[in-house]
């Protein structure tokens, strides 16, 4: 269904342990285990948290010493994210309502665009990728995760995760919007983005007390993470580009 009103209806539950929206926070350890190796040094960077929701990832980014701008369509979720940031002394985070397809920022505004649990909800993915490339500085990094459109992802993500395991609210996903890696790679390449290696991520049941966690795996047929570097002229010495290019060698 891809019902995005869910994020307004359930906004107050973003930071409630055990809620279906807070389950997304359990992905962050695996995400950062991957992305920390790509970025290397976060301190002082300007990051766009695209589709920030209630700020679950924004908080982790601020802890790494970056300045974060969080953008989301859900005003109710943005209110929760802003309130949590103020309550936890995060002066380096600001929030704005906006769409991925028409970002309200100048060209080359960010060192990093972080976009997790978002791409598979977009109705106009090409427009969003064009905007992401536009607001990135030359040599900047696009960090993402999304869901692969495979025969296995439909029953696992929609039937099992939403209806049986309760890992996501019912109606959150539409299998037709899931994205194959080669499709995303083609769009990124069209906008002068150099793609890096991707990794898979899957939920793992620990115990009735601990519940679910997420781990990095080789298999990319369900969830996958990746990154791309906005290409820069050879004469440039932009720091983020240098770190990212080292990772691709």
Where are these predicted regions, by residue range?
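A conserved beta-strand element that flanks and buttresses the S-adenosyl-L-methionine
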Residues: 114
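Conserved alpha-helix/loop element of class I SAM-dependent methyltransferases that forms part
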Residues: 25-45
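A short glycine-rich, Lys/Arg-flanked "PGG" loop and its adjoining helix->strand segment in the class I
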Residues: 126-138
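A C-terminal cap/extension of S-adenosyl-L-methionine-dependent methyltransferases
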Residues: 88, 182, 186-249
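Class I SAM-dependent methyltransferase SAM/SAH-binding core
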Residues: 56-102
